[in-house]
Amino acid sequence: MLLFLAKGTDTYPEGLSYGGHPWVQRASRPYAITHGLDGRHLSLWASHGRYYDNQKKEWRWQRPYLFCTTEDLLSQSFVYPFLIPMLERAGAVVFTPRERDSQSLEAIVDNDTPTYTGTYYEKGDWITPEGKGFSLNYPALCDTIFPFETGTSRLARGGSRARAVWRPQIPETGRYAVYVSYTTFPASADNVHYVVHHAGQTSHFRVNQQMGDKTWVYLGHFLFHAGQTEENCVELLAEDSPSGTVVSADCVRFGGGRGRVERSNPDVCYTYPQRMVQRMDTVTTDSLWRSKLLADGWHPDSIPPRICVQRDTIVTDTLAHYLYGKGITSGLPRYLEGARYYAHWAGLPDSLVTRDHGLVDYNDDLRSRSYLLNVMAGGSPFVPDTVGRRVPIELQFALHTDAGCHRNGDIYGSLAIATDYDDYGHTVYRSGLSRKVSERYAGKMMNDVAADLSSLYHVKWPQRELRVKNYSETRSPQVPSMILELLSHQSYRDMTFAHDPNFKFHTARAIYKSLLRQAWHLQGKGEPVVQPLPVEAVSATLRGDKVVLRWSPVRDELEDSAWPTDYVLYSRQGDSDWDDGILTHGSTEVEVHVERGVHYQFRIGALNAGGESFPSEPVSVYLSPTHRVSTASTVLVVNGFDRLSGPARVESCGRLGFDLSADVGVSYDYNDSFSGAQQNFQITAMRQEGVKALGYSGAELTGLLLAGNRFDGIALHTEELKGVRPDLNVVSMSRAAFDHLSSSELHRYALIDYVAGLQADVPHNLQPYTVFTEKSQALLRAFALEGRPLFVSGAHLGCPAASADSIRLVMNANFMAETLHCAYRAEADHTFSGMFYGMGMEIPIYNRPGELHYPCQRSDILEPVGASAFSAFSYSQGGFSAGVAWTAPARGIVMAFPFDCISDASVRRTVMQAALDFLLQP
């Protein structure tokens, strides 16, 4: 067998591959991937997660709170929002032994409890087969309760009219991951048809039920509206599977939920059963007996050395009994918990969840990651000669950070880890691969990541060591595996990169590319194609009664193959979810028909043979139902807020660290990596531990999702414009597209609504984010000089740009004074007050980090300039000016806080009404 090969190979032996249907495939995806990871199965995880410390009898993290985070919060902020989506957009099926959905709410719909948080019902002929399935009979789990062993599943014939429907009771409107489960049988179908109905859209999936049963099988993330409605459900259609096969239905889960595993130290009691055993006792010969035998003529060498006597003996055994009582849960969303608890929830056999009778969770957590991987991959072509669930997983990757720092402030850098033998000392994988492959894989990964980061950030990213040693996470997996210790969470310099979303994206892309090439190398193939970067300069404008969408591809200077060859256009209407997209056949300009009176959003994905990019920022269009195109006025909404940034830094007077109260930063979509505010800034405390350590931080933000830049400013402004003035047309574009316009193209617009959000060129950005480029200033100036109104809102419109020289600073100040009729005076802090005043009302804003919206923590004090300008908003009743308005040569309003940060929906609508009444006066 391959197991006993002496040396192993560097690539999979010829003919060793998986060519069947993948575990999960999105059937409604409108394109094929030929040179990416389509149909390939990978396993990866991020660090450790929260675990129960049996000695201290408390839940804790493995690492301390440093620089506003801890390792287990930080590493997953690279993996879940960036790395896993990149791999999936390349076509890969990604398995992770930890919960991946940050949604803390949950709905579970199961055949055994058909009305629990939803409704399960069937049509056609179904039976309950022998064997076990999922059931949630208990609100919490202990070490004697395993949910995939307590229930049943259902079975129907393939090709029949049987149908199963899971309709959840969704707690709140939001995005939820959808997981299905089932039982595998000898005749299971390999292409079972699931349909997800989500907020007005329908997505189709094919699931291979010949593998990966009795666990949570991820389909995707979808928008669901609150409640139990017809448009929120999952269907299984048996008629689309071949006759002669069977399809299985078990539980469907919506959302990640919160941890259910209760932990405590078990009580141990002992019993002492007795049993009878037969023993052969020995009696050594004495001198008298020996003398007698010699006298009888025995030769000295022939005398028996001993005499054996058989007798019955009673033996008392000691048996330990472990009694598991009520414990405590982590109190956190499930995605923050360690693999040991997810494995318990996700169907790992009890004998593998804990090997120490629940006495040492830390060790169980280390082992369970690899055990769950091996159980899933066992019996596949890549892990033959074992019993498992036959998922053809080829590679494993783990992302961690570690400790260490340089006193001179240099970057500490990366470390890669591999192990060249398994738990039994074997140096060859069951597939026939040499375990030396993992060493080369780890070394290449570290080199690839360092090369990309060095090039993109103009630094020399250190490669500390390729460590080939005994680590559970790299020793136990039965496929090539590695750990990348990306950086040091103890090093302030490293953390200035780690907190930045751009760095997270680029790091994840470097890892994805290295995994892509490793997977192709193991199959002995040539060069793969790297998925493109997201497109830019997106616009949605009108041509008659049609919408014209335009965009520009982005060249990846590090990857020649990453150029797009086609594009996917996605759309949504009103409050519906995004559809599955249509191809544009290579065109970067498309014309689409829209229904009048409906708010549409569009976004674009760049595509090539290697997969699809991250989506572009969305743009909106609204066509008035009450005017002909030739007479309806049109508002142009420009998104000038594309900033992504880490938090504010403290670098002065012997102090070093991050100040979340000054600026929490701007994450991509959301941030769940913060534990709490930094408390120790003393640089002399470098390399110390605990509360005395430089960077020591609090835990008040642990488990919270903090909203960042969701690129939804255009949509919100469009919705308010539509609500206030449905007679207006609304079009929109990104700032890059706006900068490509000529001044003559502005004549078609009655108003420009410029959305600046938290755009700011500040020192802690890893790249500059100018509020107004020179081209934007020129266009806005020309528009105003023609007597057309401007509506501009943002927190840092006049704040001096950190990267600007003295000439540029003067130009910016002149633009603010001459075009926006205001002058920057100082910055106001909103830590204690989130209330503005203007237009005869109080205007509340989101001023603190939270899940609903990004916060406006500080903003400009802008005073009016010019005879026609006046202060229209203030920071308190009669306080500093928070915005201006003017009447000549055209009307305009500048708000020193983001309009979309107004937290009260009715106030926001009233403010927009008042603004339009003022700006669009005849």
Could you say what each language-model-derived stretch is?
Residues 1-48, 53-60, 249, 254-262, ...:
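Non-catalytic propeptide/linker segments at domain boundaries
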Residues 147, 230-233, 239-240, 251, ...:
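Active-site-adjacent mobile loop/cap segments within catalytic or ligand-binding domains
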Residues 162-186:
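A short beta-strand element within beta-rich, extracytoplasmic domains
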Residues 317-435, 467-490:
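Active-site microenvironments of hydrolase-like enzyme catalytic domains
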Residues 758-858, 868-869, 876-877, 907, ...:
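A glycine-rich, often tryptophan-bearing local segment used as a flexible ligand/cofactor-contacting loop or short
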